[in-house]
A protein has these predicted regions:
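Membrane interfacial helix-start motif at the N-side
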Residues: 25-67
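Transmembrane helix recognition focused on a "late"/terminal membrane span
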Residues: 2-37, 70-164
Length: 164
């Protein structure tokens, strides 16, 4: 499969015109990511695949982590709705499959999402970009604990509403 950055003319021009800024913003592994962005094919990002929210937090992609957390919370909410409405076991496997699909999408498109995040932040003039070890905690909060809290709160509310 071809590289999404090379297939989009605006992204390609941005990459060519802002190489130095991108290298400064990436901080650690700058050359590695720049080669991936310039490469002819997309590469799977295994950190994004298996540890998506933590990787996003480390790379300071907090907005993207929040979006992923909302998707996970939505899937948890759908699982609860299935549990209340349906008696079948299919609901758990469907929701689990959707979670795995989300993980797969994060792994496959992780580098492109990272490029788009860098592009957005460079265009906005953000100076503090790079990596952050404390960002791993933010990623855990936004991508793991927030969806669990939202899903749990909705579950409690649904149970209270459905009690006779």
């Amino acid at each position: 499969m071809s590289n999404y950055i090379k297939s989009n003319q605006k992204d390609k021009e941005f990459l060519e015109n802002n190489e130095e800024d991108i290298l400064k913003c990436i901080d650690k592994k700058g050359e590695y990511y720049l080669n991936i962005f310039k490469g002819s094919k997309n590469k799977t990002n295994f950190c994004a695949l298996f540890l998506g929210p933590l990787w996003m937090g480390y790379r300071q992609m907090y907005f993207e982590t929040f979006i992923v957390g909302c998707c996970v919370a939505l899937l948890g909410f759908l699982a609860m709705i299935y549990e209340f409405v349906s008696v079948t076991v299919i609901s758990n496997s469907v929701i689990r499959s959707l979670n795995y699909a989300l993980m797969g999408l994060m792994g496959f498109f992780g580098n492109y999402i990272y490029f788009l995040s860098l592009k957005r932040r460079i265009n906005n003039g953000d100076k503090k970009i790079g990596v952050s070890k404390i960002g791993i905690l933010y990623g855990f909060l936004l991508g793991v604990l927030m969806p669990m809290a939202i899903t749990g709160a909705v579950g409690v509310i649904l149970m209270l509403l459905l009690i006779d």
